[in-house]
Amino acid sequence: MNDRHARRAPLEGFALRRRALLAAAPALAAWPAFAQTPPPALAAYERDTGGKIGLYAENLTTGAKLAWRADERFVMCSSFKASLAALVLARVDRGQDGLERLIALGPWDVPSDDWYAPIAKQNLAKGALSVAEMCGAAVSYSDNTCANLLLARVGGPAALTAFWRATGDGVTRLDHNEPMLNRSPPGDPQDTTTPRAMAGNLRRFVLGKVLSPSSREHLTGWMLNCQTGANRLRGGLPTTWRIADKTGNNGKDAAGDIAVVWPRPGVPVLVCAYVQGGSPGDAQIASVFADVGRMVGQRLG
């Protein structure tokens, strides 16, 4: 073999490998920051509670991501209500409904004194609320009565599942109304999503073209006005960020917070986090969501 050719071969091989690595660099940079081992705060939650936490977060401008159990199923609890409002708004966009139309409301829609329906309870004497008012109550206040009445209006849990399928989510499913949708038996796929799938829904509904600009503005406004998120992601996200979120919890072992947040105008970050299982206390759940918020602020801002 010619010595000159022998010397060239390794150099050419190096050049090819270098070009391949450079070409792959954007994809490598977009991989989750902790795909195999969770950060200490998440590991501690799973160890101390016996439950699990799932996270998917992505800066849509830089492509940077954080993920842990991002493709595992978690019970949604009330976080489904943001998608429910999106379905209502899609129907409005198609002329099938109107935000000003009234939905009847009566004492029979509040089954017990401890039933969580703050807006419905305040308005029982009126006998009705508008579609827009019920959407705002369901998303901003997590009102269960308003959510159930809206579900009935759009065709029930199966209709919401069909909406997810039609708009690109092949994972998320709703099988029950409130309060049955909050059950969390291990391994049961009913009423569940994954952090990654729900982040995709937020991207399509809040930032994408599934809804008209005015409908996106309505949905974002209701999420910006979230009244139930102080002890969730908002507990750790930078206070200067714009935060639009929807929470959920079953009062036992499951909770979630899904959000679109903006560190700066025009720089959206998706954050979807869920916990389920084990025996967590309220303080442990609040603490780990705050930890996730801080992590997102430090790594994806």
Regions inferred by a protein language model and the residue ranges of each:
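Structured C-terminal helix/loop/strand segments within mature extracytoplasmic catalytic/sensor domains
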Residues: 3-22, 37-45, 152-153, 157, ...
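Beta-lactamase-like hydrolase cores
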Residues: 31-72
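Sec/Tat-exported extracytoplasmic proteins
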Residues: 46-49, 86-96, 107-109, 139-142, ...
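Extracytoplasmic
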Residues: 50-52, 69-71, 79, 98-100, ...
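Mid-domain, small-residue-enriched loop/turn segments at the edges of structured enzyme/sensor domains
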Residues: 52, 127, 148-207
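Soluble periplasmic/extracytoplasmic beta-strand elements of cell-envelope proteins
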Residues: 54-58, 67, 83, 104, ...
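Active-site SXXK
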Residues: 63, 75-108, 138, 271
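Conserved catalytic neighborhood of penicillin-recognizing serine enzymes
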Residues: 110-148, 157
